[in-house]
């Protein structure tokens, strides 16, 4: 983790900033998806993607959620967030929705955040950690950060679209 970073648990007043980070970090991803599938399909299949992701973040930040959410502060500013889940039966932990604000990417914050998350998973008794990400060019920075944190074995997955 880089100097001056602090990781702490999510607090309710953090949600607006996490939504800002999510929107900024995922903008190129949604743009890439629209380019890949084409405008005709995107208008139907992806029309609610940003709103659905915003709702997902709101949901996983609820006190009743099964997700643990933490934030990364650089100085007094929240610059990243990550969610994790623990499956005690299978001993598999998952890094879920996460993002580093684009203004702070490329500084090792993501890698440090994932290493911290992996330490949490180990401490909770997990034996395996998983994370899902896209295979398109817009996800390349995330893939690199996951690989730096030690992820390697991957099962490829492809979503196919067509107009009807």
Where are these regions (language model features)?
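Conserved acetyl-CoA-binding loop-helix of GNAT-fold acetyltransferases
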Residues: 100, 106-119, 144, 148
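Conserved active-site alpha-helix within GNAT-family acetyltransferase domains
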Residues: 111, 123, 127, 135-155
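Flexible, glycine-rich phosphate/dinucleotide-binding loops
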Residues: 16, 91, 137-138, 160
């Amino acid at each position: 983790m880089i100097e001056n970073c602090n990781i702490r648990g999510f607090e309710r007043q953090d949600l607006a900033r996490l939504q800002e980070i999510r929107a900024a970090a995922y903008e190129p991803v949604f743009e890439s998806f629209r380019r890949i599938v084409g405008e005709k399909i995107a208008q139907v299949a992806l029309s609610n993607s940003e709103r659905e992701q915003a709702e997902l973040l709101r949901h996983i930040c609820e006190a009743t959620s099964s997700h643990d959410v933490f934030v990364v502060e650089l100085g007094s500013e929240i610059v990243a967030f990550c969610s994790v889940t623990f499956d005690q039966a299978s001993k598999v932990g998952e890094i879920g929705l996460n993002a580093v604000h684009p203004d702070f990417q490329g500084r090792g914050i993501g890698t440090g955040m994932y290493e911290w998350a992996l330490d949490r998973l180990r401490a909770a008794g997990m034996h395996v950690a998983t994370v899902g990400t896209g295979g398109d060019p817009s996800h390349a920075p995330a893939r690199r950060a996951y690989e730096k944190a030690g992820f390697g074995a991957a099962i490829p997955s492809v979503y196919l679209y067509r107009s009807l």
